[in-house]
A protein has these predicted regions:
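His/Asp/Glu-rich, glycine-adjacent segments
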Residues: 1-65
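Solvent-exposed loop/turn segments at secondary-structure junctions
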Residues: 4-9, 56-59, 105-108, 144-146, ...
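…; additionally, a secondary subgroup of soluble metalloenzymes is captured
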Residues: 4-5, 47, 230, 241, ...
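A long, amphipathic alpha-helix that forms part
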Residues: 26-40, 57-97, 250
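Sec/Tat-exported extracytoplasmic proteins
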Residues: 39-43, 54, 86-93, 154-161, ...
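Beta-strand elements within well-structured catalytic alpha/beta cores of enzymes
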Residues: 47-56, 71-78, 82-85, 97-106, ...
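Acidic/histidine-rich catalytic neighborhood
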Residues: 96-97, 103-142
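Active-site neighborhoods of enzymes that stabilize oxyanions during catalysis
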Residues: 131-237, 241-252
Length: 267
């Protein structure tokens, strides 16, 4: 794994055979060369699955906006790197090599000139803790007996630019409700701005591009999927699917049996 985010963590039982801790010092070209060197290893120690992450497009999209010249330049940079990778892998003469190119989210230019103010009542630190990721505002009500009254007050005072939810009644399809909160980190109330609106504290600045909106209502959030190699049909377009299904696809290609329940489906 070459800086695939989280793969070097010791949270799981097993780490990758070869891996690098995440940082952004390697250029795309350096990453390609490291991957090619892994593929040059003797067959008995050569990795069968390699993950590789490029942060350039995400960084430019956040800082300058997804439609900016800087974002376009970063896309060209990664596109050239992928082309270089494919060329070098082909030169190795390896058989049965497949490529899967994905993104973990989309991006949208936000309205940072007219941000939403955090409701005044939530600034009472004796009653509330708030966690603002700008495309989502999580509210922890310190007194559980006051959750319903706080929700009603927020609901009655909201504007058309955002929605207010009790976490336990958050839309199930978004996988961010009470049942999904294994470590009790979400809070009891969620304020969800409608794209491209964001919540922003007074006196703070923000970046031009964001993700984190509902992908069913904001198509800009949808991710990228390209795949090519001997197991994939050429010049074929497929319908959109949930990205959790990439995992069983990879397992199928590698001939691996998935022994635990997962969210994705191979079909």
């Amino acid at each position: 794994s070459l800086q695939w985010v989280g793969s070097a963590s010791d949270a799981g039982k097993t780490r990758p055979t070869y891996y690098y801790h995440y940082h952004e010092k390697f250029s795309p070209e350096e990453k390609i060369n490291k991957v090619v060197n892994w593929l040059k290893l003797p067959e008995n120690v050569r990795p069968h699955f390699i993950s590789l992450y490029f942060p350039e497009v995400d960084g430019a999209g956040h800082r300058f906006g997804p439609e900016s010249p800087e974002a376009e330049k970063s896309v060209q940079l990664v596109d050239n790197a992928i082309g270089n990778l494919v060329e070098k892998v082909n030169q190795l003469g390896l058989k049965n090599v497949n490529f899967i190119f994905v993104s973990d989210h989309g991006m949208i230019k936000v309205d940072k000139e007219n941000p939403l103010s955090i409701p005044e009542m939530l600034l009472n630190k004796e009653k509330f803790d708030i966690y603002n990721s700008q495309t989502l505002l999580r509210v922890v009500v310190k007194n559980p007996d006051e959750v319903k009254s706080a929700y009603r007050e927020l609901k009655n005072s909201k504007t058309e630019d955002y929605q207010v939810f009790l976490t336990k009644k958050f839309p199930r399809k978004l996988h961010y409700g009470t049942k999904d909160d294994k470590y009790s980190r979400i809070g009891q109330i969620l304020l969800v701005p409608n794209a491209p609106k964001i919540f922003l504290e007074k006196g703070k600045s923000t970046s031009s591009g964001k993700h984190g909106y509902n992908p069913r209502k904001t198509p800009e959030m949808k991710a990228t999927f390209y795949a090519w190699g001997n197991v994939f049909k050429n010049q074929t377009e497929i319908n959109e699917f949930q990205n959790v299904s990439v995992y069983p696809l990879v397992a199928e290609i590698l001939g691996l049996k998935i022994s635990e329940p997962i969210d994705g489906k191979f079909s």
